[in-house]
Design a protein with these regions (language model features):
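Long, heptad-repeat coiled-coil alpha-helices used as oligomerization/scaffolding rods
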Residues: 37, 44, 48-51, 55-58, ...
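Alpha-helical scaffold elements lining the catalytic groove of polysaccharide deacetylases
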Residues: 186-214, 225-274, 287-293
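Active-site beta->alpha N-cap acidic-glycine motif
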Residues: 104-192, 196, 200-209, 297, ...
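Hydrophobic membrane-insertion alpha-helices, especially the h-region
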Residues: 22-37
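Active-site beta-loop-alpha junctions enriched in small/polar residues
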Residues: 132, 157-159, 183, 222-224, ...
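C-terminal domain-boundary segment and adjacent tail
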Residues: 148, 160-162, 286-330
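Structural recognition of the beta-strand scaffold that forms the well-ordered cores
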Residues: 125-129, 152-156, 177-180, 217-221, ...
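N-terminal Lys/Arg-rich, disordered targeting/topogenic segments
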Residues: 1-17
Length: 330
């Protein structure tokens, strides 16, 4: 082989070798590229799967929350139904209780009307006692009234009533009526307004309510002094003004015999008669003694002892703000 041929042969071999190397390099690059792509694809698939799993978890959570919300709405509705059911049951119970109260009041009204009709035909007398209660005299008087089944009306002063609430409670418990004689026995006519008059009797009203369970419906102004303002104040407070027909002047004489003499003076138009309201004061021992004899005499003369409201209801009724001295038979 000549040198030229050898050189050409050598160049071809080199070229072939270079081509082979190039091809191998390309193959290696391709393999690496495919491997990287495969890895990337695997990573992408894995990421996609993770995303799908996460989405599935979120969808499951959303579904669970929707179920909880739906159940929550159901529970809320159930609770509301139960609440309304309880309210309905209570309303029905209240209605039944109210109806029973109405029935009871109707029975009492019928009984009162019948009693008033019967009382109206009898000789009636209403004994009233002012300025108490006295710590010793009033309980003694109450003992006698209870013994003889006599009902009376007591007009108490606030400053005294406050000290003897137990006596007021006893009065009410034994069927007597407790009325207001002002807080401090001041002349109500000297007060300049309806509000001042109300203020002058309001504390006594509260004391009576606390002791007896009921607000008084009767006011006896100190000294019997009244005017348009006093009447208006009483009307607004739902109270009737109770004066008297028979003034025994027991506060002045302090003498049992003179008290009885004034009360039964046949020559006086202001002595005891059917329908009269009698004024006395239960803070004096002489008054208590006179009241005992008076009751015995009136019993013998056929009188029925009534409270002021009983007297007025039997003989025409009473209205807030009106003034009453007596209730004579028509």
């Amino acid at each position: 082989m000549g040198y030229g041929q050898y050189e050409r042969h050598t160049r071809r071999r080199c070229n072939n070798t270079s081509l082979t190397v190039t091809i191998i390099a390309l193959v290696v690059c391709l393999v690496l590229a495919l491997t990287g792509f495969a890895l990337s694809l695997t990573g992408a698939k894995r990421a996609a799967q993770e995303l799908n799993d996460k989405n599935a978890q979120q969808e499951a959570r959303i579904s669970e929350l929707e179920k909880q919300l739906e159940q929550s709405d159901v529970n809320a509705l159930k609770e509301e139904i139960e609440r309304l059911q309880k309210e309905l049951e209570k309303a029905n119970a209240d209605k039944e209780a109210l109806q029973e109260q109405i029935n009871e009041l109707n029975r009492r009204l019928e009984a009162k009307q019948q009693q008033n009709g019967e009382l109206a035909k009898k000789k009636l007398i209403a004994l009233t006692f002012d300025d108490g209660p006295g710590s010793r005299t009033t309980p003694e008087l109450l003992d006698f009234l209870k013994e003889h089944n006599v009902k009376a009306t007591f007009f108490v002063i606030g400053i005294n009533a406050k000290k003897h609430k137990d006596i007021l409670s006893r009065m009410a418990a034994e069927g007597h009526v407790v009325g207001n004689h002002s807080d401090q026995h001041k002349n109500l006519k000297n007060l300049g307004s309806v509000e001042e008059i109300k203020k002058a009797v309001s504390e006594c009203n509260e004391i009576i309510k606390e002791a007896t369970g009921e607000y008084p419906v009767l006011l006896r102004p100190p000294g019997g002094s009244t005017n348009a303002l006093v009447k208006q104040a009483c009307k607004e407070m739902g109270m009737s003004i109770i004066l008297w027909r028979v003034d025994t002047l027991d506060w002045k004489s302090r003498d049992k015999d003179k008290i009885l003499e004034v009360a039964f003076d046949k020559n006086s138009p202001y002595s005891i008669r059917d329908g009269a309201i009698v004024l006395m004061h239960d803070i004096y021992p002489t008054t208590v003694a006179a009241a005992k004899e008076m009751i015995l005499r009136l019993e013998s003369e056929g009188y029925t002892f009534v409270t002021v409201p009983q007297l007025l209801q039997a003989r025409g009724g009473m209205e807030p703000g009106n003034v009453y001295h007596y209730a004579f038979p028509s």
